[in-house]
Every structure is written in C-alpha cells, then in structure tokens.
UniProtKB/Swiss-Prot annotation:
SUPFAM superfamilies for this protein: Alpha-L RNA-binding motif
UniProt protein name: Small ribosomal subunit protein uS4c
Gene source species: Trimezia steyermarkii
Domain S4 RNA-binding: 82-143
Family: Belongs to the universal ribosomal protein uS4 family.
Keyword Mitochondrion assigned: no
InterPro entries (alphabetical): Ribosomal_uS4 (IPR022801), Ribosomal_uS4_bac-type (IPR005709), Ribosomal_uS4_CS (IPR018079), Ribosomal_uS4_N (IPR001912), S4_RNA-bd (IPR002942), S4_RNA-bd_sf (IPR036986)
Gene3D superfamilies for the chain: Ribosomal Protein S4 Delta 41, Chain A, domain 1 (1.10.1050.10), RNA-binding S4 domain (3.10.290.10)
Lineage, uppermost ranks: Eukaryota, Viridiplantae, Streptophyta, Embryophyta, Tracheophyta
C-alpha cells in the first residue's frame, strides 16, 4: 500500500495515509523522463487502486462507459463513484473502500430496506442506504462515523448520522469526485490497448 501511494500520490479510498511532501520530488528526480505510456498507465493504476478494482473489472467499466452517451471519461467516473462500497466510503460510514466492501460482504448494509451483499451494486438517485437493525452493525457504523475526518460531503449524498442513514440525491458531478485524476488518460490507455 505505502509503495503505491508513494509512487502514485494520495489514494484516499485505499488508505488514509498521505505520501510525504518530499517523496514526490525524489520520485521525479529518480525516474527521469516519463513517457506518455507511463503517464497513462499511472493514471489507470491510480483509478484501479483507489477503487480497489481488478484489471478485468476496470476494463468492464471502461467498455460500459464507452457504449453510454456522453464523455466516456465522465461516465466511467460516474459508474465507479455510484458503486455501493464507494458511496459508503464517501458517506463516512467506512474509513476506506476495502473497509466498506467488507461491511457490504458481511451483510451489514441495506439499500431501500433490502440487504445488499454485492459491493459493486450500482446505486441510483433516491436510494436510501441504512445499516441492519442489529446492535453489532450499528456499533461498527457508529465507530466509523465518529472517527471519520469530517470532510465536506459531496452534494450528491446526504447523511443522517443519528439514524445511520444515507441518501443518494443525484448522480455525482465531476467536480465532487474525491480523487485527483485525468480520466481521459485512462480512456486513452485502454483505447490504445485494443
């Protein structure tokens, strides 16, 4: 993990750790001239590690985004941001995306009153995300909410920390994506692979 954040920069979905301020400069000095391929590859890896996806999963999302209307890069980010594990992370109900994935896999999360145990479940506007009515589930979420660094909540989400309830208001806007990334380079990377 730490090698990844040292090489790629801050990945809030993977870990709350940040690279040291001088490590960026050392990396650039050591690496010399970066080729266009390497720049595209690093952007793709940043996206992959932040959202915790395998190469195959990311490729699937790129294909879906390519077939959809609108900018492929923007649609790709919307698809990734609207995953249930990512929404839990952005709501502050989990400290990292892998932590959110574990909550979903262990059946602690309900979407619109139904248990969902698929982390890649695509949330839609007006979805209500709550915890199971069990004490253990509520304690887990309560600890995460209490320890979460109260960053500004994106405008497409609303949370009620007392009822352990989150609401998806709308599909995310590009400016609220929690990662500094050039998604066009990721799309370019895959378009050159085929």
């Amino acid at each position: 993990r730490f090698k990844k954040i040292r090489r790629l920069g801050a990945l809030p979905g993977l870990t709350s750790k940040r690279p040291r301020s001088g490590s960026d400069l050392k990396n650039q000095l050591r690496s010399g001239k970066r080729s266009q391929y390497r720049i595209r590859l690093e952007e793709k890896q940043k996206l992959r590690f932040h959202y915790g996806l395998t190469e195959r999963q990311l490729l699937k999302y790129v294909h879906i985004a390519g077939k959809a209307k609108g900018s492929t890069g923007r649609v790709l980010l919307q698809l990734l941001e609207m995953r249930l594990d990512n929404i839990l992370f952005r709501l502050g109900m989990a400290s990292t995306i892998p932590g959110a994935r574990q909550l979903v896999n262990h059946r602690h999360i309900l979407v619109n009153g139904r248990i969902v145990d698929i982390p890649s479940y695509r949330c839609k506007p007006q979805d209500i995300i709550t915890t199971k009515d069990k004490e253990r589930s509520k304690v887990l979420i309560q600890n995460y909410i209490a320890s979460s660094s109260h960053e500004e909540l994106p405008n497409h989400l609303t949370i009620d920390p007392l009822q352990y309830k989150g609401l998806v208001n709308q599909i995310i806007d590009r400016k609220w994506v929690g990662l500094k990334i050039n998604e066009l380079l990721v799309v370019e990377y895959y378009s050159r692979q085929t």
